[in-house]
Curated annotation (Swiss-Prot):
It catalyses: tRNA(Leu) + L-leucine + ATP = L-leucyl-tRNA(Leu) + AMP + diphosphate. GO terms for molecular function: aminoacyl-tRNA deacylase activity; ATP binding; leucine-tRNA ligase activity. HAMAP family: Leu_tRNA_synth_B. One of its GO terms (biological process) is leucyl-tRNA aminoacylation. This is Leucine--tRNA ligase. It comes from Clostridium tetani (strain Massachusetts / E88). GO terms for cellular component: cytosol. Belongs to the class-I aminoacyl-tRNA synthetase family. Keywords: Aminoacyl-tRNA synthetase, ATP-binding, Cytoplasm, Ligase, Nucleotide-binding, Protein biosynthesis. The keyword Ligase applies. Pfam families: Anticodon_1, tRNA-synt_1, tRNA-synt_1_2, tRNA-synt_1g. The lineage of its organism: Bacteria, Bacillati, Bacillota, Clostridia, Eubacteriales. A motif ('HIGH' region) lies at residues 40-51. A motif ('KMSKS' region) lies at residues 572-576.
Amino acid sequence: MGNYGTNIDRKWQNKWEDSNLYHFDTNNLDKKLYVLEMFSYPSGSNLHAGHWFNYGPSDSWARFKRMQGFNVFQPMGFDSFGLPAENYAIKTGVHPKDSTMKNIETMTKQLKSMGAMFHWDNEVITSEPEYYKWTQWMFLQLYKNNLAYRKNAPVNWCPSCNTVLANEQVLDGACERCSSDVIKKDLTQWFFKITDYAEELLEKLDDLDWPENTKSMQKHWIGKSIGAQLTFKIVDSDLSFDIFTTRADTLFGVTYAVLAPENPLVDKITKEDHKAEIEAYKEQAKKQSEIERQSITREKTGVFTGSYAINPINGKKVPVWVGDYVLSTYGTGAVMAVPAHDERDFEFAKKHNLPIEKVIEGGETLPYTEDGIMINSEEFNGLESSKGRSAVVEKLEKENLGVKKINYRLRDWLVSRQRYWGAPIPIVYCDKCGTVAVPEEQLPVKLPYDVEFTPDGKSPLSKCDSFVNTTCPTCGGPAKREVDTLDTFVCSSWYFLRYADNKNSEKAFDPKIINEILPVDKYVGGPEHACMHLLYARFFTKALRDMGYLNFDEPFSSLTHQGLILGPDGLKMSKSKGNTISPDDYIDEFGSDVFRMYLMFGFDYTEGGAWSDEGIKSVSRFVDRVERTLASCRYYINNPSDDKITIDNNEKDLNFVRHNSIKSITEDAEKMQFNTCIARLMEYTNALSKYINEDNKNSKFLKECVEDFIILIAPFAPHFSEEQWELLGMTYSVFNEKWPQFDSKALVKDEIEIAVQVNGKIRDRITIASGLDEESIKETALNSEDVKKYTDGKNIVKIIIIKGRLVNIVVK
């Protein structure tokens, strides 16, 4: 066992804190680098290995960049509002504020034991009034700019969590938090108008240095469709409904239309003798999730309303049905059905014996869903689909029955929640003045402490009279506060803006400061936030830019997703499975640098993998070996015998490894390929070990090599490297050293070994001068005794030379 351990960790953590080593210089922003890891939910009592995998390696990357001369800003905070913290409090019987602050205290100690460069002076805690005052201010800015509104709508309701969920929080028809089946409920809720930014959110994705899969997920979620909105009038009525379609070329093939069960028009057009059946069908639809309703494998159900609509292109009557596969939350809540050219419509028509009329030529069987030539389409016959679409819409535009339109799958962001542990929405309701925004000078609207927050479907704040009853800011009369709280994603949609100006009591942030430090240069976190936090933060940034507060378009210039650390059994860690890994236990045994280095060496950073105790033990043995090797190097440096000043073959060999390590580690660390960085350090250790066992050594040269080695290992083992740097006699931090540059000349060996093949099979390896010309290489290869066995008496067809690697002799 070496000397490295938690005692050395603590020693250097104290020194770093006392010396303010990682100070971010706000007066020198030319080479600023804002490095940010997604902050934690303090809903559990401890950080786990997954948190470490996010924070540790990314801190190593930040250290590496600091040593390259960047002025690094790396803050940390806690996403402390929301369901996870509230559910934890309900489970333990401790008030959310008390349990949250206790958990934050524990997690802060754990994060500090990591030895990361976090700027704790810039900490934010989203559940503190000093922070959520400005979350409420953000709400008011959106409200003033018509980007926040309240409406009655069918919403996703989790009966277990007893709260509304945004569309993004429903996974396969279930609550992302508790996996309960989500149902639909009509409620009056607050929304943010993210759809106003749909096009820009889509367009700007291509400019971002983000994982392609994440960009694809956002593109799919935004879901742009270019088509037309067409109007179908109800027969014998002044009522009508609009549909959106990308296939106006198939309009002559419409044989029926379908409305969503929730569409308000259903009640107005349903004939008396169909009402009972329609009502029963609507009730049944309420029990189905949107995912279930849209499943391609599920049988398509529906009920006829008794009414007919007029196909706008040919004046034909088509029956109007109600079907639960149509959603009121997407498009217009109504669809035209073309069974000959749509699989879903075809299945529905077959089941209900509805007409099927082919209007696009192509395919041997129906439905034919590709483009083709229009047929049975009157004056449009013979047109190719793309031209036909334009021609049909042009005709309908002249008759005010259609218009070209772009549709998006993206829905407005539902932000109100019927839970306690969140930022109160700064709105009051007055009988005289209506809906009134709380004046900015009255912020924050504080969350009361003494509230019964056990979920029962009602907003907990509605039970707190002292909170609910207030005075109208406009007329001074009695009023009632909004009792819903904001979705926790509202808090995290702007936290990256607050860090750099977190003590500002007059503003959410000073635009002058933020516009110099932002955007975030490197953001690190899990891919599970692709369609929620990452999308919402982009929306907030663009909205604040348009209000004049920001001068940049995107919050995160570069994004990296860390992989997932699994339990030793290869399964996702969970307490119920008993396969969780507690960093504290391993740090106590091995030290935080060994834990950090194992995470970087044992896994591809973007992929992760299964935890292995043997893996961390092997890294511990490597650190011990480095310690012994450096001790031997120091001994010779301080006590040289038979010392020399020349650079001979042994020195050249070590110098090659030294500069090859500098080159490789620099390139790989930049790309966050940490496992190969550690592998190069292992090779460098072997080279140092080999050199100190030579008879004659150059102590001055050896010291230079040791210095570079310690600098190279420093980002990956910060405490250990500081200790080794000090033992080498240095009186300043290794992190104040500049990152070394490789010497390309040192990477050119005087002699190299190359393989010699005969007809593609290796027959010998020869050592040649690195600059040897091709004719001399051929001659040396042909003179090899091992090669002659396979070439003598044969015709040499050609000799292929791949410089520095091999010679291939082709014979017959």
